[in-house]
C-alpha cells in the first residue's frame, strides 16, 4: 500500500491529456508527426514550446515537465491514422517508460488517439480518445485483460471488466476503481477491497449528456501492483 500515493500521482500525469483545452498546435507545412515525436523524445522544450499557441504554451510545458520528471526515459511513438471526417486528422500515440520507486521498478505504457483539426497552419480542437494507461511492477507476470468500451451511448448501461485470466487458487488479490469526468478525482480515494471473483466487474450507466468519463483503479497481487486509467467517450450516436 505504500506505493499507492505515488501511483496516484502517475495516474494524474496522464489524466490531464483527456481535456481538449490542452490542444497541440504546430505549423502544418512540415511533418507534424515526425517533428513532434522527435521533440518529445529529445526533450527539446524550446521546440515543443513552438508547437503550442501562446495561451496554452505555459500549461503544456508544465505538464510535460512533470512527465519527464517522473519518467525521465519515456519514449513517444506517433503514427498517423486516417480521419473519420475529411478535415479531421488522427494520431495514434504510444508512450513507454520506467521508474524505480522505493526499490521497485514500475513500467509505464500509455496508448491513446489524438484527434484534431488544422486552421491557419495550426492544429486546434485537439482531443484525446480511447486512452488506456497502465503502470505496473509485476514484470508482466499478471495476465490481465481490460474490457472497457471505447465509446457508449448517452444514458445506456455498460460493463467494465478487468479480468485476471489465471486461476487464483489460494492467492489473495485486492483492488478498486473510481470514475470521474474532471479534476474532482484529485479529492477522491480509491478504496482497496479483496477481489474474490478474480478481477473487477462493474455495471454502470453513462451520463445523459455527451462527455468523457475516466476510470482509474488499482489491483494488488502477490506478483506486483497494477494501476490503470481508461477513458470512455459518451456520445449521442455511434
State the predicted function of each range.
Residues 2-5, 9-41:
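Short, low-complexity N-terminal intrinsically disordered segments enriched in polar/charged residues
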Residues 220-229:
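Short acidic/polar inter-strand loop motif in beta-rich domains
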Residues 45-100, 105:
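Short solvent-exposed beta->alpha transition segments
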Residues 106-143:
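Short beta-strand edge/turn micro-motifs at domain boundaries
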Residues 147-153:
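Short beta-strand segments of immunoglobulin-like
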Residues 194-202:
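Aromatic sugar-binding surface patches on proteins
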Residues 205-212:
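Surface-exposed, short loops/turns at beta-strand junctions within beta-sandwich domains
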Residues 158-167:
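Short edge beta-strand/loop segments characteristic of extracellular beta-sandwich folds
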Amino acid at each position: 500500500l505504500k506505493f499507492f500515493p505515488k501511483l496516484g500521482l502517475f495516474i494524474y500525469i496522464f489524466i490531464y491529456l483527456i481535456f481538449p483545452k490542452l490542444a497541440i498546435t504546430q505549423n502544418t507545412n512540415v511533418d507534424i508527426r515526425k517533428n513532434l515525436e522527435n521533440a518529445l523524445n529529445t526533450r527539446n522544450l524550446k521546440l515543443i514550446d513552438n508547437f503550442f499557441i501562446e495561451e496554452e504554451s505555459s500549461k503544456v510545458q508544465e505538464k510535460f515537465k512533470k512527465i519527464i520528471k517522473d519518467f525521465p526515459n519515456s519514449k513517444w511513438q506517433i503514427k498517423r491514422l486516417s480521419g473519420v471526417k475529411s478535415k479531421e486528422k488522427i494520431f495514434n500515440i504510444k508512450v513507454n517508460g520506467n521508474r524505480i520507486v522505493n526499490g521497485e521498478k514500475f513500467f509505464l505504457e500509455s496508448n491513446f488517439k489524438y484527434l484534431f483539426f488544422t486552421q491557419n497552419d495550426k492544429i486546434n480542437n485537439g482531443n484525446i480518445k480511447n486512452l488506456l494507461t497502465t503502470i505496473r511492477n509485476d514484470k508482466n507476470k499478471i495476465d490481465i485483460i481490460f474490457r472497457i468500451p471505447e465509446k457508449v451511448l448517452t444514458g445506456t448501461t455498460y460493463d467494465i471488466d478487468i479480468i485476471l485470466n489465471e486461476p487464483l487458487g489460494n492467492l489473495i488479490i485486492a483492488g478498486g476503481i473510481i470514475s470521474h469526468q474532471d479534476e474532482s478525482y484529485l479529492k477522491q480515494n480509491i478504496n482497496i477491497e479483496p477481489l474474490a471473483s478474480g478481477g473487477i466487474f462493474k455495471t454502470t450507466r453513462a451520463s445523459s449528456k455527451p462527455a468523457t468519463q475516466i476510470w482509474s483503479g488499482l489491483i494488488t497481487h502477490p506478483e506486483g501492483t497494477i494501476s490503470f486509467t481508461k477513458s470512455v467517450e459518451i456520445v449521442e450516436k455511434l
